[in-house]
């Protein structure tokens, strides 16, 4: 039997997965603009393959692709009546790939409906989350992730709804171009408020790359020293004056040249561990190569992963499928060594 997320976190850092919607858009399965996840219904094999890539890279958690799978958001693409089918399919695909190797997280996301002064809007958000959770929990997710909340108030509703399921709850906020929530709360204030509301894991995700989340994460760590801390940054470079990648003119179609290298994401994972982050994952732009390097520095590479080690004593032909005589190559290597 798999250990639950809280048990695993007590044993040390847990490695999450990467981004789904932008990567699937690049592959031709998700529409830019709405970024809704109907791929779980229309092209389940494409989603299954991406889950497999993250699993094989070393991810210990797979998130069901239910981000933006709420009724109102799906209505923007005429799929409001497929909410249950979509949420159910997304969880089943993730669980099938996860098997006994990974945990599966249900997912709630920002709704674009939250209004801080409107009780009716808050009730609508609450009903939206409850509707998705009923399906996801019924399909057997291991815990709930609520993410990408710029409004702390909306994040608190996610905590409230998710806690009623009885499952562990992780909720992360996102900062746009200021180090504040939409209400003007600091990272420390947000983290403490979420923990006090019952969140088991708190932190930050999306919008910003690693370099622009470390400071607020350190503030969170100081504010909630006994809580589990999560980080899931994007894998794109952004300038200091515009850390939110969605505010850049390159979003969403010209982000390729801004993508972080696998080594940069490995450095992020190492730094995150050093400052006390417990759940180390990634978001938009992070693909399996990034997760694999993160797994490497966190010593979480799957046992079956083959590690290629550079050996400058060997010619490149030793690594490529060139048509050559192995004996001849060996003789040349011996001669080269003898000449030294």
Protein language model features and the residues they cover:
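Domain-level signal for soluble alpha/beta catalytic cores
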Residues: 1-340
């Amino acid at each position: 039997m798999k250990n639950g997320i809280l048990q695993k976190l007590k044993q040390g850092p847990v490695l999450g997965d990467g981004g789904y919607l932008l990567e699937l858009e690049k592959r031709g399965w998700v529409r830019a603009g709405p970024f809704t996840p109907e791929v779980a219904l229309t092209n389940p094999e494409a989603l299954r393959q991406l889950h497999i890539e993250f699993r094989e890279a070393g991810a210990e958690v797979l998130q069901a692709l239910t981000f933006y799978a709420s009724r109102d958001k799906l209505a923007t693409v005429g799929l409001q009546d497929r909410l249950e089918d979509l949420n159910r399919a997304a969880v089943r695909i993730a669980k099938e790939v996860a098997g006994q190797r990974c945990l599966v997280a249900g997912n709630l996301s920002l709704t674009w409906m939250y209004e801080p002064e409107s009780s009716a809007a808050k009730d609508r958000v609450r009903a939206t989350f409850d509707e998705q959770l009923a399906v996801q929990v019924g399909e057997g997710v291991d815990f709930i992730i609520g993410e990408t909340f710029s409004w702390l108030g909306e994040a608190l509703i996610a905590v409230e709804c998710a806690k009623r399921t009885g499952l562990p709850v992780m909720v992360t906020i996102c900062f746009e171009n200021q180090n504040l929530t939409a209400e003007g709360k600091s990272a420390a204030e947000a983290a403490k408020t979420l923990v006090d509301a019952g969140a088991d894991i708190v932190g930050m995700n999306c919008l910003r790359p690693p370099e622009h989340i470390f400071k607020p994460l350190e503030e969170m760590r100081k504010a909630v020293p006994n809580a589990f801390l999560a980080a899931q940054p994007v894998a794109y470079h952004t300038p200091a004056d515009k850390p939110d990648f969605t505010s850049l003119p390159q979003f969403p179609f010209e982000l390729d040249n801004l993508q972080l290298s696998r080594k940069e994401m490995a450095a992020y994972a190492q730094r995150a561990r050093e400052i006390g982050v417990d759940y180390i994952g990634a978001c938009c732009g992070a693909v399996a190569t990034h997760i694999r390097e993160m797994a490497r520095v966190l010593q979480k590479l799957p046992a079956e992963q083959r590690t290629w080690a550079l050996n400058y004593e060997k010619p490149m032909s030793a690594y490529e499928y060139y048509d050559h005589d192995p004996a001849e190559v060996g003789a040349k290597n011996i001669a080269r060594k003898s000449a030294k």
